[in-house]
């Protein structure tokens, strides 16, 4: 498990803001420093899809930044982090990263993470996908990003929506060697 590390969490406007919120909760329990960016679209999605206020979500993070603040600490490669998780990642955010637009703090921080060869995990949320979406995913993967859509697994027999959410975020946290006891891991036994 990583100790005294910093992880950037971004919540974009795609459906599934609960993934980002649950990540923040788990990382807070693990005493891992989080740097949060909530897009304007995500603020609307959080209000529409969850019981959380924006302030409650921000309270889960150690540091919060406005998505328009391109001068924030996380926009510089000299600010050391373990990497970044965008949960959920909209197709707009994916496209911005794939084409190096860096027109918001989310896409700027993602670009920094890629150029510094740190971990960038995109929990992409869209279905069905057209060829442009797939090409953007391929570009980001070529740059070193990891495309990790929150696809449920059923071998652990989920009975609650939180079981499905926890499975997806555990898989993402595995990339950072962060151990949790949220799920039953696959075993042939």
Swiss-Prot record:
Entry binding sites for FMN: 13-15, 39, 90-93, 125
This protein's record includes keyword Protein transport: no
Task performed by this protein: Flavin prenyltransferase that catalyzes the synthesis of the prenylated FMN cofactor (prenyl-FMN) for 4-hydroxy-3-polyprenylbenzoic acid decarboxylase UbiD. The prenyltransferase is metal-independent and links a dimethylallyl moiety from dimethylallyl monophosphate (DMAP) to the flavin N5 and C6 atoms of FMN.
Keyword Transferase belongs to the record: yes
Alphabetical UniProt keywords: Flavoprotein, FMN, Prenyltransferase, Transferase
Catalyzed chemical reaction(s): dimethylallyl phosphate + FMNH2 = prenylated FMNH2 + phosphate
Name the UniProt record assigns to this protein: Flavin prenyltransferase UbiX
InterPro entries: Flavin_trans-like, Flavoprotein, UbiX-like
Pfam family, one: Flavoprotein
Family: Belongs to the UbiX/PAD1 family.
EC number: 2.5.1.129
Superkingdom, taxonomy of origin: Bacteria
Binding residues annotated for dimethylallyl phosphate, in chain numbering: 155, 171
Molecular function terms from GO: carboxy-lyase activity; flavin prenyltransferase activity
Record-linked Gene3D superfamilies: Flavin prenyltransferase-like
């Amino acid at each position: 498990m990583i100790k005294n590390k910093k992880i950037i969490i971004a919540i974009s406007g795609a459906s599934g803001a609960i993934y980002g919120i649950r990540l923040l909760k788990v990382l807070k329990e693990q005493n891992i420093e989080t740097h949060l960016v909530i897009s304007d679209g995500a603020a609307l999605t959080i209000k529409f899809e969850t019981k959380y206020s924006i302030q409650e979500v921000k309270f889960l993070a150690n540091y919060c930044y406005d998505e328009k603040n391109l001068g924030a600490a996380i926009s510089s490669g000299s600010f050391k982090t373990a990497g970044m998780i965008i949960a959920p990642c909209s197709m707009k955010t994916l496209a911005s990263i794939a084409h190096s637009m860096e027109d918001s703090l989310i896409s700027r921080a993602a670009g920094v993470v890629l150029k510094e060869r740190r971990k960038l995990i995109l929990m992409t949320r869209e279905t069905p996908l057209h060829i442009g979406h797939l090409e953007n995913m391929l570009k980001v993967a070529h740059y070193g990003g990891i495309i990790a859509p929150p696809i449920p697994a059923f071998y652990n027999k989920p009975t609650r929506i939180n079981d499905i959410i926890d499975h997806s975020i555990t898989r993402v946290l595995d990339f950072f060697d962060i151990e949790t006891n949220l799920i039953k891991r696959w075993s042939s036994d």
